[in-house]
Regions:
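Iron-sulfur-associated redox domains of electron-transfer enzymes in respiratory
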Residues: 1-118, 345
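Metal/cofactor-centered catalytic core regions of large enzymes
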Residues: 86-93, 97-427
Length: 427
């Protein structure tokens, strides 16, 4: 059952867990799907992009909304034929797929009007939008313009927009890029759609231990188990991005089953990945970030993989009583970020096993799995400005590897602000 899934606000893990069901096939392109599954709430700023994604799914097709506690938003008005489901997701999707293929359920019509992507009729010397050998918008599609190359040549440069639902990127991330072949010669990052207050995380997202720790005491064991699971979930997604989907599923199962003190399976996983030369070839030396560029950003594992012992837990007496010390790497590349998260997952499980009844003291900030989290923002907000300079000059494959290794979460800042606002209202 081919499904293209869009994880809305606060639903990242629930959508990820669908991969564990043998009846589900989450595909990487809408052209291979029959069902568009939308989980949670979608920012209004992404409604048009979601409609374009819907219209690129071939017939027969159906949109399914899985609310997961989220209220209906304005975006649903563009999907009048959608089906809402609450539970038994694989079974319901299987039934909808069967109805589509048998003709019992009609295919959904397009949402957007059938208009040209850009004016082209009667434009140019031949009336088809082109302006010569290069340039223009023939039949509404842009052609490559000549531009400078890193080797001093002038080659074709093609504009390309990637996101906001590209499966390898975090939901909401949009890159406006220019490519010469597969080389990124120019990159711009659009504004984070999750910080415009058009959507807030749903109730399930608001109950996460790191968000709660901003305003209330939380068990260290709960926090460290959640940290280890978050790192393993990242490993599972990163393996899928490296075309190692079967191994990624094994890691995802481990992430859902791991318990405090269970560090041996993670150590074994780290050894297996160390032997997997495919990962070494694709990550070693890729996306290197110097420590100076990360100083003071609270970038968590990304900073520690570049040699900065930057970790709020080192200032917490409860952690110091457990003998906690930050783990660091030296290389600062994608491979180091892989090693960093695996090492921290092992460390967190050991800490969770020894934490007993120790609890945090709320200070308004917390070391999340991705770095310093506070109501003013999460680590993704501080890393996004680095992306253009980091990616420009890279081959596309290395750029994807680099972005995956950063483990960006664009929703985190919005969710943290919403949690703090909710606590203020309640008081």
């Amino acid at each position: 059952m081919p499904v293209f899934a869009v994880a809305g606000s606060g639903t990242r893990e629930q959508v990820q867990d669908l991969r564990l069901d043998v009846h589900m096939q989450l595909v990487d392109t809408p052209r291979a799907a029959t069902i568009l599954l939308v989980a949670g709430a979608i920012p209004e700023e992404l409604a048009e992009a979601l409609a374009r994604l819907h219209d690129s799914i071939p017939h027969p097709r159906c949109t399914v909304w899985w609310p997961l506690g989220a209220p209906s938003g304005a975006w649903l008005g563009s999907f009048p034929h959608h089906v809402a489901i609450e539970d038994q997701v694989p079974g319901r999707l299987t039934a909808i797929q069967r109805e589509l293929l048998s003709g019992q359920r009609p295919s959904e019509p397009p949402i957007l009007p059938d208009v040209d992507a850009a004016p082209w009729r009667g434009v140019g010397p031949f009336g088809q939008g082109g302006t010569g050998m290069t340039g223009g918008t023939p039949y509404g599609r842009p052609m490559a313009e000549l531009g400078p190359d890193r080797d001093g040549l002038r080659l074709d440069v093609l504009p390309l927009t990637v996101g906001p639902f590209f499966p390898r990127f975090p939901a909401g991330l949009v890159l406006d890029a220019k490519l010469a072949g597969d080389i990124l010669v120019e990159v711009a990052v659009r504004d984070n759609p999750f910080v415009t207050n058009s959507v807030r995380g749903n109730d399930r997202a608001g109950r996460g231990p790191f968000l709660r720790a901003l305003t209330e005491p939380v068990s260290l064991a709960e926090l460290e188990l959640a940290r280890a699971r978050a790192h393993l979930r990242w490993v599972a997604d990163a393996l899928a991005a490296c075309e190692l989907a079967a191994l990624g599923l094994r890691v995802l199962r481990l992430a859902t089953a791991i318990m405090p003190g269970d560090s041996e399976p993670v150590e074994s996983l780290a050894r297996v990945l160390g032997w997997t030369q495919a990962l070494g070839w694709s990550t070693r030396g890729v996306g290197r970030i110097e420590a100076a560029a990360l100083e003071g950003l609270g970038a968590g594992p990304v900073a520690r993989a570049s040699g900065l012992p930057d970790d709020l837990r080192a200032q917490d007496q409860a952690y110091r009583d457990l003998g906690f010390e930050p783990i660091v790497q030296a290389e600062g590349d994608a491979a180091a970020r892989w090693r960093q998260r695996l090492a921290e997952a092992t460390q967190s499980l050991e800490l969770a096993g020894r934490a007993g009844d120790r609890r945090t003291i709320p200070t308004g900030s917390i070391e999340s799995p991705r770095g310093l989290l506070e109501p003013a923002g999460g680590p993704a907000a501080r890393l996004l400005p680095l992306i253009p300079g980091l990616l420009e000059g890279m081959e596309w494959g290395d750029a994807v590897t680099t972005l995956v290794s950063l483990d960006l979460d664009l929703e985190e800042a919005s969710a943290a602000a919403g949690q703090a606002h909710g606590e203020a209202v309640a008081s």
